[in-house]
Amino acid sequence: MQTMTSRSMTGHSRFTSTPCGERCRTIARVVLAAAVMAGGFVSTEEAHAAPLMAGAAKVDITNVEAGPVNDPLFVKALVIKSDTTTALIISVDAVAIGEIGHIKNDYLPKVRSRIEKELNIKPTNVLINASHCHGVVCSDVDERTFQAVKLASQNMVAVHVGVGSGHEDRIMENRRLKLKNGREVDVRHAYSMPADEEVAEVGPVDPEIGLLRLDRADGPKAGQTLAVVYNFACHPIQGVPNGGNTADVTGFASKVIEDNLSDGTIALFVQGCGGDINPIMYKDVEHPRSAEPLGNLLGLSALKGLRKVQCKSDERLRVINETLTLPRADVAERIVAMEAEQTRLLKSLKGTSLNLKTFLPLVVKYNLSDEFPSYYSHRYLHDKKLGRDDLGKLDADNRRNMKAYMDNIYTMEELTRVQTNLALLLKHQAQNVAAGKRTIDVEVAGLRIGDLTLITFPGELTVRIGLNIKQKSPHKKTFVAGYTNGYIYYAPTAEQLLNVGGAQEDSDCILAPEWQALFEAKAAEILKKL
């Protein structure tokens, strides 16, 4: 929000001397003083609008009936108000805002409607972001969301605003692998990895932690931090050793932040463009899966950045919420091609002499000694002196049988990838046909708080899209949040959608490739308005 100020009027009169002399100058000074006292003129230094008001709260939303609980899940609310605008950020420890997981599709309209009715906050000014952790929330999550918002709105205080960045590149990796044959696959527990020698390169990550800090502006707690909003791109799906319900990486990170700032600080995580970003060492089989060390690193890196943030009085607050129409995908031809590939792979499987019991010992032997795998070397030398090569022929047979067995394994691994992603394509093709139209309408929001600008989208944006928007933004501090105000599955780049059926991001998607240019153009348009 831009503040209108009057032209500066100082105590030094700018009236020039006239024939009326000192009497006129005296009258002018009296009139000027009266106008200032009446509020008709305000100096630049005195023209500051009232500081932003803010309130923050959190409510536990853990489903305690869904099995063992490792750590709590929360819904957190941050209400920010200027003289003319009220904005609301809600962060939910859940996989999505509707469509998948345990939050139903009526959650967003129900929560917004009640907030508007009872708290008079416009639905378009309500931004609800899912952390994308895979924890299980309680059945009355909508009621508890409203409770958090109400608590926040009842405890508003004047705040100073600071914006900055942190850096963290140790806890995540791009999960899309570019193969030497030009295709791409992804790193999932749903299927196995390609052979190491097939992998050519990996995609980028975004190490920036977007930071917003709100400090109390006055009163006995002046200077203490009321709330922090931090934005980062990574799937928080590492899990915990006991397999219990967890808010995962970002839940632990938020706890680190809250425990190390002022008493009562609320840390809201806003998921970024983490569609193709996994926790580091995601498929490690040597150690228990544990999100806590990764969350601790993220939290400490956020704190390091927060220490450098300077808060100041800044009344700028604006929300822009627009509807964007995007094209739906038609993958019917790709489905036919993948079904043909599925059949080809299945028919390529051949019978082998070996089974698992005989294959594994041979693999060990032939990898321990390439030249003399079947016995000690002297037996090979002995046979050679006698003109025999019995062990050599045995080795040739064993190597041929091992290769046949390995070929079947690689084929079966490829078959599982094809079948898993084909099922996703079939699901979304049916959804798009059932929709009855070739497009889908989505919410794209822009938020400005002081020096911070934020763009939101309801899909699982991949990291390159966030990097593009940040790079082209006219503002110094722009952040991007997927998983916000709804859920429309993955939203990969147009280039990634050339790989349809090869990885989850391009298979678990309802959008046509043209969507990316439309969204990035809309984001640029909104950023200019902010």
Range-by-range predicted roles:
Residues 1-3, 33, 37-38, 211-219:
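Short regulatory "switch" loops immediately downstream of catalytic or recognition motifs
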Residues 4-32, 43-44:
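Bacterial N-terminal signal peptides that target proteins for export
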Residues 37-46:
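C-terminal segment of classical bacterial N-terminal signal peptides
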Residues 49-266, 272-296, 306, 312-530:
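Conserved beta-alpha junction segments in alpha/beta enzyme cores
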Residues 299:
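Charged, flexible cofactor/metal-binding loops and thiol motifs
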